[in-house]
Amino acid sequence: MVIQTSDYLQHNGIVKGKLTKSYYTLFRPENGNIKATLLILHGMQEHSGRYMEFAQYLAEQGLAVITYDHLGHGRTAKNTEELGFFQISNPAQQVVNDAENIADYLEKRYSDVPHFLLGHSMGSFIARCLLQQAGSRFNGAIIVGTGGKVPGAKLGKAVSALLNKIAPRHRSRFINTFFNKQNNLRFKNEPNESGTNWLSVDKNNRQAFLQDELCGVLFSINGFYTLLSVNVKATDRRWAKTLPQAFPMLFISGSDDPIGNFGKGIKQTVSDLEQDGFKDITMKLYTGMRHEILNETDKQNVYNDIINWIEKHL
């Protein structure tokens, strides 16, 4: 059995005197026998509730798992107008700080067990930034659905930084549509399910995403500025230089995931780490799976691989 509790955790804001708060859910085994913790960072235009089944499974295996909604997402957003908008001043640093604050909460609550980090998609880039900032908090990291350098990302960051000062809350349907269209290029011969084909092979998962009012909300200019900022920092050639070379990392992705350039991005990331002397890097591409490998038809295989990797590193 799993005990599940939800609440809000307050953070100090980057803007002096301003506080932020995150909606989180903690999953833990009812018997109290906890062998490790896991902090999960979700992706863009979704929310932590989509990881409930995965978190419950891990809690049944003896982990204390915490999921939470980033700024501008899920129940952390104060209202629907806040969805897709983070904050005007240094939003990328704020989301990384929020993640560290959640990690600190989990670490203090379960101080005598190993702590692990998992980030998916945008959450994978936030996770990589968090490892730069506070890698010593963790005993290992699972990077899901990540990518390498994106051509034009630095230019996009510069342009969006300027637009963030002019019209941060503006939601460009063109930019949002372009983003989805690029991700769907490989699948253009399939019947288009409102631009969600790239997310997964599982059509039920696509429909669940489309029917979830907290998913797929148009990102604001500020949202894309935040996304590009964490992406550029996370994909720097020496992004992991603050981590010890023995730090264990598991990189997993679908072979048909456009965010990882269909395996090329994750392979390059792992190759760079190995060239830099990292000794405990594991990579697995799941044949035929797309972006959301935690929500695919064969997701149980992914779940099993993750728990086996964690148990190997206890």
Walk through the language-model features, giving the residues of each.
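Short beta-strand element of the alpha/beta-hydrolase
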Residues: 34-43
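Short beta-strand/loop motif that positions the catalytic acidic residue
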Residues: 251-253
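Conserved alpha/beta-hydrolase
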Residues: 50, 55-81
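Alpha/beta-hydrolase active-site loop
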Residues: 87-107
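Alpha/beta-hydrolase-fold enzymes
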Residues: 127-214
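Catalytic active-site module of serine/aspartate enzymes centered on a nucleophile-bearing elbow/loop
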Residues: 276-314
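Active-site glycine-rich loops that stabilize anionic/oxyanionic intermediates
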Residues: 42-46, 121-122, 255-256
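Alpha/beta-hydrolase fold nucleophile elbow
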Residues: 109-121
